[in-house]
Amino acid sequence: MSYLIIVRHGESGWNVDGRFGGWVDVPLTGKGIKEALLCAAELEGIDLDVTFTSKLIRAQETLFLILSKQKKIGVFVHEEAGTGEDRTEREDGSRKDRKEKRYAYPPNTEKNLIPIHSNEALNERYYGILQGKKKDKMKAKYGEEQILHWCRSFDEGPPEGESLKDIYRRAVPYFEKEIFPILQDGKNVIVCAHQNSLRALIKHIEGISNEDIRKIRLANARPVIYTFSGGRLVRENAETDPSVKRNL
């Protein structure tokens, strides 16, 4: 049996300021740091093997704080496109670049080193015309019902921005290709990311309908823990888990 832990980042400066953060790189607040450390304490009994996060600092900071409690040092894994000499040949004679995953230094040189995979597929929603704007001002301009629809529905997002369906299309293939095989190898994985990229993963893992996903909200820095056994992921304490709020 192995574990999959998904964690939304701790409170950020723009959570406090009431702004749509999206892809804007906003760090944690003092409260967010404390939340991440409390999350780490909840995970002390699970020895982490591999980590995944987005390209945004608030998710990365949350991950670093969790790893610090386990006395582990994260080593970023970088994907590099191959050079001309590194290309592989397809059956039809065409060529494609081979991507290699490289560490700044070997990850197995010390027992406390742990790989960190950082990818835009796990980024928060790109909010389009709402990006960086004050939530109360946008509700006054477009109406609270419209804002809720853009932010909660599966198929429709804010103008010039992403819907949850768009996020699902980038996050779920990444999960299936990069994360699921590691769970199959019996390793414990943590994913530190964002409200909407994690909602997309929860929808996929738990088979939640397009309508019911509207009701799912994630608390800051509260772990959602799945056990993986027999090819299936099952959430622990699914009915009482305070990390996942089933309301608007």
UniProtKB/Swiss-Prot annotation:
> Which SUPFAM superfamilies does the annotation name?
Phosphoglycerate mutase-like
The pathway to which it is assigned is: Carbohydrate degradation; glycolysis; pyruvate from D-glyceraldehyde 3-phosphate: step 3/5
Q: Where is the active site?
A: 9, 124
List its EC numbers. 5.4.2.11
Q: Return one GO MF term.
A: phosphoglycerate mutase activity
Which reactions is this enzyme annotated as catalysing? (2R)-2-phosphoglycerate = (2R)-3-phosphoglycerate
Q: Where is this region: Disordered?
A: 82-101
From the UniProt record, give one GO term of the biological process aspect: glycolytic process
Q: Which family does it belong to?
A: Belongs to the phosphoglycerate mutase family. BPG-dependent PGAM subfamily.
Function text: Catalyzes the interconversion of 2-phosphoglycerate and 3-phosphoglycerate.
What name does the UniProt record give this protein? 2,3-bisphosphoglycerate-dependent phosphoglycerate mutase
Origin species, per record, is: Methanosarcina acetivorans (strain ATCC 35395 / DSM 2834 / JCM 12185 / C2A)
Gene behind this chain? gpmA
